[in-house]
């Protein structure tokens, strides 16, 4: 069993995402350390990919900046090992099937384990193919995180019943990015999930203000924020750690 459940032991969880290697690997390490210091309960580390289909323009551009800087999957593993020496909160990777295929499931997951990572999120992994990856991940105590999008009640329950670590509930169809308003009936999706599993539920895609975080954490176990953090990195570059710290703290304070 992974340590992901630790993220949900101190009340509502704030989960932050950042692209590894943007603006550079050293600053990335500082940014992720400041995220933990600001109150992140779990960090999603994005392994950059040239065609991140689930991402909106903010994270797509971060992936391209990182790749142009020479970031590789191996360098992300090394970066994560350094981060693991500085923070003790759970860490998960977010990447795409192509990255796993090229690397090989077993070798990727072995390196993820050695880097101190507890889970992987693969947005383009079909639910029907999840077991193949999870069977390898089980060898290394790594959870393959399930994503639940607005869909039929039966499918929501099927995906949730099989989930490990936490359930990433997608607030709206489409790509990641900041939204001023989320119209999906997330309350009913979360209640469908909770009717079949005790696995914690976190809501992501579009959350960027303390008010939104407070609203959705009222019925979910945590909130996930990516684009708003990545946007601060794009805006402030090497000076981003202090801005990210302040932002994370404001979001965590809102859901306490």
Where are these regions (language model features)?
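Hydrophobic faces of well-ordered beta-strands that scaffold small-molecule active sites
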Residues: 14-18, 43-45, 91-95, 120-122, ...
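Glycine-rich phosphate-binding active-site loops on the catalytic face of alpha/beta enzymes
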Residues: 40-51, 117-121, 126-129, 171-177, ...
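Active-site-adjacent beta->alpha loops and helix N-cap segments on the catalytic face
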Residues: 1-7, 49-59, 71-81, 101-107, ...
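Glycine-rich beta-to-alpha transition loops that act as phosphate-gripper elements at the mouths
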Residues: 19-24, 94-101, 126-127, 147-151, ...
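Alpha/beta catalytic cores of nucleotide-metabolism and tRNA/nucleoside-modifying enzymes
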Residues: 191-199, 208-214, 218-256
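Conserved, mostly hydrophobic/aromatic
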Residues: 16, 35, 46, 112, ...
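N-terminal amphipathic alpha-helix/helix-capping segment at the start of soluble metabolic enzymes
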Residues: 1-18, 79-85, 256
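Catalytic cores of alpha/beta
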Residues: 25-35, 151-161, 203, 207-223
